[in-house]
């Protein structure tokens, strides 16, 4: 248990940041699922639009330290590849 006032404050701050980070990751996951759903449906326009919406959010996740840059690079590469594969 935290004894100093600063340690107690850090616990409060960490809990608040955890909520923000969880929301950010959830938003990214939702956007990725939209791309995957559009690809599964074979809708190239919707998939491309969803990918354009997901990419900056994923980059923001890296900038904020929520996701690792290699993870985002891999996900973005795979999504782009799947969107481009639609006939």
Curated annotation (Swiss-Prot):
Assigned keywords, A-Z: Ribonucleoprotein, Ribosomal protein, RNA-binding, rRNA-binding
Which NCBIfam families does the entry mention? S20
Point out the gene that encodes the protein: rpsT
Example of a GO cellular component annotation carried by this entry: small ribosomal subunit
For this entry, the protein name equals Small ribosomal subunit protein bS20
Q: What does this protein do?
A: Binds directly to 16S ribosomal RNA.
Q: Do you know which PANTHER family this protein is assigned to?
A: 30S RIBOSOMAL PROTEIN S20, SMALL RIBOSOMAL SUBUNIT PROTEIN BS20C
Supply the source organism's classification: Bacteria, Pseudomonadati, Pseudomonadota, Alphaproteobacteria, Sphingomonadales
Q: Which SUPFAM superfamilies match?
A: Ribosomal protein S20
